[in-house]
Amino acid sequence: MDPLIAGFDWDEANRGKCRKHGVSAAAIESVFQRPIAVFPDPIHSRGETRFNAIGRSGEGRHVLIVFTARKRVDETFIRPISARYMHAKEVKYYEEEAAKIEKR
């Protein structure tokens, strides 16, 4: 995990939304322990900036996470909004893009 991130901001609402898609809090947190790609999501950012992260869980499954970063005093916490396992087309695209980056 990025040393600037102090931890995760969980409550029953965001845990439930992630569980609805079959992704546990542990799987989501494990994605942030590994290399990930993060993209801003200006279309869905209302009031606070949302991001999309794609990466692999500790189990090796490809995960898409929608999250925001929340400041508390001088620390930043990741607040997952939703997460799901990526579809086959998304995995293929992710793997192709990752291969291009590795060749650089």
Residue ranges and their predicted role:
Residues M1-R104:
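Ribonuclease/tRNase effector modules and their secretory precursors
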